Curated annotation (Swiss-Prot):
<dbReference type="GO" id="GO:0010629">
    <property type="term" value="P:negative regulation of gene expression"/>
</dbReference>
<dbReference type="GO" id="GO:0016567">
    <property type="term" value="P:protein ubiquitination"/>
</dbReference>
<feature type="region of interest" description="Disordered">
    <location>
        <begin position="1"/>
        <end position="34"/>
    </location>
</feature>
<dbReference type="GO" id="GO:0009908">
    <property type="term" value="P:flower development"/>
</dbReference>
<dbReference type="InterPro" id="IPR044274">
    <property type="entry name" value="RFI2"/>
</dbReference>
<dbReference type="GO" id="GO:0090227">
    <property type="term" value="P:regulation of red or far-red light signaling pathway"/>
</dbReference>
<keyword id="KW-0287">Flowering</keyword>
<keyword id="KW-0863">Zinc-finger</keyword>
<dbReference type="Pfam" id="PF13639">
    <property type="entry name" value="zf-RING_2"/>
</dbReference>
<dbReference type="GO" id="GO:0005634">
    <property type="term" value="C:nucleus"/>
</dbReference>
<dbReference type="GO" id="GO:0007623">
    <property type="term" value="P:circadian rhythm"/>
</dbReference>
<protein>
    <recommendedName>
        <fullName>E3 ubiquitin-protein ligase RFI2</fullName>
        <ecNumber>2.3.2.27</ecNumber>
    </recommendedName>
</protein>
<keyword id="KW-0808">Transferase</keyword>
<dbReference type="GO" id="GO:0009585">
    <property type="term" value="P:red, far-red light phototransduction"/>
</dbReference>
<keyword id="KW-0833">Ubl conjugation pathway</keyword>
<feature type="compositionally biased region" description="Polar residues">
    <location>
        <begin position="248"/>
        <end position="266"/>
    </location>
</feature>
<dbReference type="GO" id="GO:0008270">
    <property type="term" value="F:zinc ion binding"/>
</dbReference>
Amino acid sequence: MAGAKDSGCDDDLRIAGGCDPGKRGNPEDSSSPVEVSCSICLESVLDDGTRSKAKLQCGHQFHLDCIGSAFNMKGAMQCPNCRNVEKGQWLYANGSTRPFPEFSMEDWIPEEDLYGLSYPEMQYRVHWCPFGELSQAAASFEELEPATTTYHTEFHGHHAAAVNHSYLAYVGPGPAATPRTSDNNSTDDHPWNSHSNDHFHQLPVAPQYHHHSPSFSLPAAHVVDGEVDSSAARGLPYAHPFLFSHRSNQRSSPAINSYQGSSTQMREQHHAYNHQRQQHHANGPTLASPLISMTRRGLPPPPPPPPMPDQNVGFFIYPGGHHEPETDQIHAWERDWFPHFPVPSNHRTIPSLWHRHF
């Protein structure tokens, strides 16, 4: 019949359900590809190579970038259509199974030790010491101490002799300082070390026996400056303060070590000076004293000092007593370099008058 023939399907196929009345052609044509849309971006999932696609185990297909964004947000591969969770180990774009990179405790510790002893955290190059090692911190503070403008009075080692008196005699201008004694032998940071190789003038000490001088008393020790003529001033280099010591355990100084004489030569100079002093008293004074004494009102002026046997800068020491016993002897500067000088037995308490003579 024509109606049956027009339908394109015979009776057997229609009963079996293998023929669709609204579709013409062979039964093999029913296997043609079907367009599938992505439920995330609502675009067609095509296998044309423009975009990658992913097919889950449930059969639903999505674009690979779309299902990947959903996986990054949820942390699990769950189908947006049927809500089934895919089992298995899924990798993120960074190649890890976790959305963030793994960090261990070692990664959180910085490479640079912030509390190292050599790491400056404070101003002025002060090193931080978190372990209580105060010795290393003190060594760091030594670098911060500026060079002082005053004379240091800690004399130890071979640089100068220690002093027990309350006065300080020095050559040249300089601020006054209070002498202190120290037994420490570390003299590396002493500001005088830079002048240890300089030429030092020897300072001969002229004794006064006071056998021919009238007795007088002074209230305290004075340091009197004499007149400096131009020739002597031009020949004076930078002068350092030198101290006289009366202690038994005296130490050597660079000024004494630089002297090339011996105790025998000093004794010979001492005898020559005594002979010249006797001639000076016999012939009378020939040179007016340039010294200006500072005494109390009403006291007689001190006697003029005798001239020095040489032209070197020197100090005259006038003990405050009169007719002292000559058995009490001390050494000035060094025990082996200078002769014995008579001083009063209580020389540690009686003040003296100091004159500087050029």
